[in-house]
């Protein structure tokens, strides 16, 4: 019997983004680990996991969180340790979105969006996805609209990290408006 896909995916994200060493994995500078070694690490919690199952998770992930190259796998974004990412630059998006609990609004409007414990700020090309992401951190969520051209004019590069996920070093407050 296969374990629940969502649970395995969450564990994959935890391992690949935050704590590979806890499972005996050593990522390279781009965050890749051996696919076989990841499968073995996942089996310590979910013994039924197979490489095929992990590949299905990667192929069907709605946000494009993972990437497989040959016999290696990595998280495409969200790392809390330094990783050299080689993502394509997004030069076309006009507006990006970020959902956040209302309680964070005063500091965001004053200081902008910062990566906090991660390498980059995560934003979305999709309003609904941004709101859903924000709801993981609180019930009363507001939608921030980010002017991508404003970011580019200030020298910030926006990278395509997932299907609708974009990452940027930070977002200054003057590039943010509150959606109505």
Swiss-Prot record:
Enzyme Commission designation: 2.7.1.-
Ranges that cross the membrane: none
Coiled-coil boundaries: none
One Pfam assignment: PTS_2-RNA
One GO biological process term: tRNA splicing, via endonucleolytic cleavage and ligation
Xref: SUPFAM superfamilies: ADP-ribosylation
Top-level EC class: transferase
MF term (GO), any: tRNA 2'-phosphotransferase activity
Keywords: NAD, Transferase
Gene3D superfamilies: 3.20.170.30, RNA 2'-phosphotransferase, Tpt1/KptA family, N-terminal domain
Family: Belongs to the KptA/TPT1 family.
Name this protein carries in UniProt: Probable RNA 2'-phosphotransferase
Organism field: Thermococcus kodakarensis (strain ATCC BAA-918 / JCM 12380 / KOD1)
Gene name of this polypeptide: kptA
